[in-house]
From Swiss-Prot:
Protein name, as recorded: Pyrophosphatase PpaX
Enzyme class: hydrolase
Active-site residues (renumbered): D9
Disulfide-linked positions: none
GO biological process: DNA repair
Keyword Thylakoid: no
UniProt keyword annotations, A-Z: Hydrolase, Magnesium
Species this chain originates from: Bacillus thuringiensis (strain Al Hakam)
InterPro entries: HAD-like_hydrolase_sf, HAD-like_sf, HAD-SF_hydro_IA, HAD-SF_hydro_IIIA, HAD_2, HAD_sf, PGP-like_dom2, Pyrophosphatase_Ppax
SUPFAM superfamilies in UniProt: HAD-like
PANTHER family attached to this UniProt entry: PHOSPHOGLYCOLATE PHOSPHATASE, PYROPHOSPHATASE PPAX
Name of the gene encoding the protein in the UniProt record: ppaX
Length: 216
């Protein structure tokens, strides 16, 4: 089956938001729980929804913690977000070649739009599924299924690209092929354990992979 659709995670995949996310967590946690959390303590928080993460910390303050996190995140967004090499050129080429491209993210839409605008990727994506659009987040298949439906695409004709196990398992649950990115903050071996179909060392690796898949 040939691939005609590519779905991307956003944070840590298309744009480098690692420092923004870590700083947002540390600011929030230091505000409410001084001197209890270090940088390495918040790395596992990258990937799950804010609600899931903060529920495990303090169920009585979830909404308060989310509000604090998002305020810091918005205020420092543009200074802390960076680009990944070859991302813009690769997505541009995928569109040029006629691929359907979409984003499936656990972020809120407002912050997603900020990131896409800053990285100039906003012109390429017709479909962006955020946490605001679904009841269940990755690795549940719902977000991917929604994106595929909006793109009029079939799972077996799609590839999910991401930096976290939520993306890889989410793709597997939805029936797509999967590609993990080796630049994940959690390390290459972490993602290899989830057996993605492909491992990308840079985003442009996607182009020959898709070419080979569609040649067979």
């Amino acid at each position: 089956m040939k691939i005609n659709t590519v779905l991307f995670d956003l944070d840590g995949t298309l744009i480098n938001t690692n420092e923004l996310i870590i700083s947002s967590f540390l600011h929030t946690l230091h505000t409410y729980y001084p001197n209890q959390y270090k940088r390495e303590d918040v790395l596992p928080f990258i990937g799950p929804s804010l609600h899931d993460t903060f529920s495990k910390i303090d169920e009585s303050k979830v909404e308060e913690l989310i509000t604090s996190y998002r305020q810091f995140n918005h205020d420092h967004h543009d200074e802390l977000v960076e680009e990944y090499e070859t991302v813009y050129e690769t997505v541009q080429e995928l569109k040029k070649q006629g691929y359907k491209v979409g984003i499936v993210t656990t972020k809120a839409r407002q912050t997603v739009e900020m990131g896409l605008k800053l990285s100039k990727l906003d012109e390429f994506f017709d479909v962006v599924v955020t946490i605001d659009d679904v009841e269940h987040v990755k690795p549940h298949p719902e977000p991917l299924q929604k994106a595929l439906q909006l793109l009029d695409a079939k799972p077996e004709e799609a590839l999910m690209v991401g930096d976290n196990h939520h993306d890889i398992v989410g793709g597997q649950n939805a029936g797509t092929k999967t590609a993990a990115v080796s630049w994940t903050l959690k390390g290459r071996a972490y993602l290899e354990a989830y057996k993605p179909d492909f491992m990308l060392d840079k985003m442009s690796d996607l182009l020959p992979i898709l070419s080979d898949m569609n040649r067979s």
